[in-house]
A protein has these predicted regions:
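Sec-dependent signal peptide recognition
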Residues: 1-7
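Short helix-capping/linker turns of helical repeat alpha-solenoids
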Residues: 30, 43-47, 59-61, 66, ...
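N-terminal signal peptide c-region/cleavage motif recognized by signal peptidases
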Residues: 12-14
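Terminal, low-structured helical/coil segments at or just beyond the last alpha-helical repeat
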Residues: 121-156
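Hydrophobic face of amphipathic alpha-helices that form TPR/SEL1-like repeat modules
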Residues: 19-25, 37, 41, 52-59, ...
Length: 156
């Protein structure tokens, strides 16, 4: 069992280094290279890489801006508990960009999950979305938060 854990750690370290290298490329404006570096990790389900691919599609960094693809990449990462991606999904639901219409109930849910996960900006977004909601919508959102929180953050 220890050997398996050790092997996993050895495999995870290079992946983390690749993602950090891709972040550096993004900061340097080398977006196409960053996309190529992130793509394998994102395709294999790494939440950090998925979130960064979402950012790239949302902002048109190295790829054509595509709100639907951005939302899908954010959602993949968010479902794995990535707080930044959860805020991204919340924002898309709040404004409705790339979606049929805004959905404040789901925006509230995702911002709340993001805040639970540790995103410091999520609380600010949550305050803003609450101003647009009815009491009934907030009640519905609380139900969704409880449903998702149980399996996404079982120890919080």
């Amino acid at each position: 069992m220890r050997q398996l854990a050790f092997a996993f750690c050895l495999m995870a370290a290079p992946l983390a280094a690749e993602i950090e290298a891709a972040r550096d490329m993004m900061e340097e404006g080398r977006f196409e290279e960053a996309y190529e570096a992130l793509w394998p990790a994102a395709r294999s389900g790494n939440a950090d890489a998925e979130e960064l691919i979402g950012v790239m599609y949302a902002m048109g960094l190295g790829v054509p801006r595509d709100d639907q693809r951005a939302f899908e990449w954010y959602l993949r990462s968010a479902m794995k508990g990535h707080p930044g991606a959860q805020s991204g999904v919340g924002w898309y639901y709040e404004v409705g960009r790339g979606l049929p219409a805004p959905d404040l109930v789901r925006a509230y849910m995702w911002y709340t999950l993001s805040a639970i996960g540790g995103d410091p900006d999520a609380a600010i977004s949550l305050e803003e979305v609450v101003k647009k909601m009815t009491a009934e919508e907030i009640d519905k959102a609380h139900i969704l938060v409880e449903d998702y929180k149980v399996w996404m953050y079982p120890f919080r």
